Structure formats: C-alpha cells, structure tokens
Amino acid sequence: MGRLFGTDGVRGVANTELTADLAFKLGRAGAFVLTEGTHKPKILVGMDTRISGDMLEAALVAGILSVGAEAICVGVVPTPAIAYLTRKYKADAGVVISASHNPVEYNGIKFFNKNGYKLKDELEDRIQSIIENNFEGVPSPTGENLGRKITCESAIDDYVEFAKSTIDVDLKGLKIALDCANGASYKTSVETFRELGAEVVVINNDPDGVNINKNCGSTHPEELMDYVVKQGCDLGLAFDGDADRCLAVDEKGNLIDGDFIMTICGKHLKDQGKLKDNMVVVTVMSNLGLSLAFDKENISTIKTKVGDRYVLEEMVKDGYKLGGEQSGHIIFLDYNTTGDGLVTGLQIASIVKETGKTLSELASIMTKLPQVLVNAKVPNNMKDIHEKDAEIAEEIKKIEEKLNGCGRVLIRPSGTEPLVRVMLEGENQEELDKIAHALAKMIEEKANA
C-alpha cells in the first residue's frame, strides 16, 4: 500500500477509495496510537455536510469504540472548531471527516492531537503501519471495557463564543454578505456575525448533502462578488466546505484573496505592536506583490512549501503570529492551531470597523502582479516529470529567461488530486496565459504518453 496520508489527512472518493472499511481501520488504529496509556480516552469527531459523512462517521466511530476509547460526536462543525474544541474539552484527540474544498464525491479523514495540531508524518506513518500489520498488538476489549459514543450538543455554541472572543469590537453598522459554500460554516458563521451586531445577508447556507462547494464558496466566489454589490454590503466573506479557509470581497465586488488578507492583517498587527519580529510566514505560491507591499511596511516574510501544515510548522518553531496561503488558509496562532475561516473573516471585519476605512482602501497597499495557474492532468506516478524530462526543464529555463527577473515559473504537484499546477507570474497577463497553457499542455502530453 502506498502512503495513505496526503498533505491533509487521508482523502479519496468516498465508498470506492475512502471506504467504510478503511474508515473503521483508521478509527481503530488512530485511537490506539493517539491515546496510548490513557484510561478511557476521549476522541472528538466532527464532519462537514457531505452525504458520505454519515457512512464514514459510523465506521470511524466503530473503530474508535473497538479499542475502548470514547467517541464524542459533535456533528457538523468547521474543521477549525474541532482543533479548538479538542483543547477546550480536554479530549485526547480530534478527527474531522471532510474533504475541505474538494467536490462532493470526495471525503477525507484528518486527525488532530490533543493540542489541536495536525499530526506529524511519523504519527501518520505509525497509524498506517498498524493497519498494514493487521492490528498486531492492538487490544480488542470486551464487556465494560468497550468504548461508548457520546453526542455533544454544545459544540456550535462553544465555538461561536470562542470566535467572538478573538476581536475586541462589535460589528454594528457593517453590512456583511456570507457565502457558506453549503458547508460546515452554515450555522457558526451566520450566528457569530449576527451576535456581534452586523447586518448579515447569506447565500449558499442550505446544505443538502450534495451541494457542498458546488459553484459557490471560496473556490467559486463569483456569485458573492455580484451579491455584495447588489446588496450594497461593506464586505463579503466566502468560506470553503469545512471553513478552514476564507476569502473576502470588497464593497466594489473585487476579490480579496489570502495574499491581500495577510497584507492587511500583517500591517494592522504591526501597527498595534503585535506582529512578532515583524514577520509573516507565507508559501512559495504567494504573489510577488505581497513581498513588495511588505517591504514598504518593513515586514519580512519566510516562504515555505505549499500546504498550511508547512506554514504552521514554521510559525510554531519561532512563535510567529500570522501566516497563510493565497487560497485563504490563514493562521492566527494567538487564536487557533490551524487555518480558521471564521476567525479570519472576523479579523478583516474588525479592521474595517476599527480603521473606518473601506476594504478596497485597506487592500490598496498591495498591487497584485498578474498570476496564471493552469492544472495539468498527470498520473500520480508522473507528478515529478517536470524535474526528470530534459525538454520540459529546458522549456521552463527559456520561459524564466524571457520573464527576465520580473516574474517566475513554479510547478508543484497536487497533494490530493492527480495533477500538477503550473503557475506563472509576470507583468503581462495575456502573454502569461499563453505560455502557461502551452507548458501545461506539454507536461500533460508527455506524462500521459
């Protein structure tokens, strides 16, 4: 068996790749590894709104109970809520059943340790090796030593109270549009903003099990961009299916992506003396415009590989407070141990309220360089073809010479799907489009030859 865990837990098409059998095994092995030596350990279990969530939850919980651990089921909540509530409830671990921004047929299983952090590779490998070794040495308790399933009704309220505590102002006088992606934030985000006094209008908050992320949310913000202008809102916020990411829309209907959000929040934290070492952790995918804007503000950046886990590792290592990705995974380490869409949205809204500036005015400190991202479909075992194939390497070198220091080429494999992402940055959008599509086509043809 290849490595089960990708960049963000175990992902796959539910019922064919991520089967009930595999969910049971992950529950059993995960509970064993994460709670060794604990008497009657407690594991928190939450999920997003996908139809396959019920099937996978039943199997996962069965696995947890089979090693004598208790499963505390909190139902549909955002991924960051599990990270927070695992700490608050003093659970021994947390598990989320979600495939985040992926289409409905996918699902995933992601573990958090008792401190609310995603697992390190070594722990994931231990879980996998227990499954591969047929649960050798894993107990099968009987009678009173089996685990119980406990349903927890207070999770949403507890998470909303936590989210509200991350800002010091009320939001009265602001009109805010929310796009909940028919996902896990459909209750929490609406309740939080309303309780803080904002006038809230909402789209895509009617999940039916199959409409999660469908032409909505942070992966498809076009509807929200129109809606903000039509409704005369001060800003809009788009979450993804499990609400660990958030993108914003300004009052003119312009998209404010994660790079803009980090620039706005980074400057605000620095002005308040709250940005440790005036440092923000970003990834190699962040726009060059972000670095230029931060240079003007005397803010430094550290660049990591793509993936919020790598951003988080760097932040934890040196205690940095702000980090994130262009996609809207923003981590405010003072508040939560993972990307948190609701906390991110609240920081943006509070800065608009505190400064009295419009979001478009706040965003004007950064000018985005044209950036083109094209997916090339390649088999999983060919994701490194751009490094191995001499013709592709030569083509990339030519493109970089052409961009002449005012842009760059970045090719990176997806951690969750059979594709590589071809990213070009430079000054001329039209030219970049042509070059990126031609390069993606070349990679696709060679990888599938």
Curated annotation (Swiss-Prot):
Pfam families given in the database record: PGM_PMM_I, PGM_PMM_II, PGM_PMM_III, PGM_PMM_IV
Matches recorded under InterPro entries: A-D-PHexomutase_a/b/a-I, A-D-PHexomutase_a/b/a-I/II/III, A-D-PHexomutase_a/b/a-II, A-D-PHexomutase_a/b/a-III, A-D-PHexomutase_C, A-D-PHexomutase_C_sf, A-D-PHexomutase_CS, Alpha-D-phosphohexomutase_SF
Protein keywords: Isomerase, Magnesium, Metal-binding, Phosphoprotein
Residues annotated as the enzyme's active site: 100 (phosphoserine intermediate)
GO biological process: one example: carbohydrate metabolic process
GO molecular function, a single term: phosphomannomutase activity
Record-given protein name: Phosphoglucosamine mutase
